[in-house]
A protein has these predicted regions:
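Conserved short beta-strand edge segments in small beta-sheet-based binding/regulatory domains
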Residues: 90-106
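Surface-exposed, low-hydrophobicity interaction/linker segments
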Residues: 25-55
């Protein structure tokens, strides 16, 4: 896996970075989408900060394909998802994105669909 990290967001201290992200969003992108992805990052970061549910971490883009990842940190993946899901669902780029929420050693993974499912 080859990639690069775009931006290291850090609006809160070390929330739970020692144990890794509690939520990851895997999405497809094309290089022409980067400005829209950066705008989406700003919306996510603002909403997470305003709600006080954690922080948006780094965004990763794989150089050998069109895979992108948002990493999010905080104490409760469910509260975090409640805050970010309307923003993710509003973006066509996030249609069919895969969300993984971590609960300690257990994970829950599902796909974002436009039109209300998950």
């Amino acid at each position: 896996m080859h990639g690069f990290v775009c931006g290291q967001r850090s609006s809160f201290g070390a929330v739970t970075k020692a144990t890794g992200p509690i939520m990851m969003v895997h999405f497809d992108y094309y290089p022409k989408d980067l400005p829209r992805i950066h705008a989406l990052e700003h919306r996510l970061e603002s909403a997470i900060k305003l709600a006080g549910v954690g922080e948006l971490g780094e965004t990763e883009f794989h150089l050998d394909g069109n895979d992108g990842y948002f990493y999010m940190y905080g104490p409760d993946p469910d509260r975090l998802y409640v805050v970010v899901s309307p923003i993710l669902k509003s973006s066509r780029m996030m249609t069919d994105a895969e969300v993984t929420k971590r609960y300690g050693s257990r994970t829950e993974t599902f796909v974002i669909h436009r039109g209300g499912l998950q």
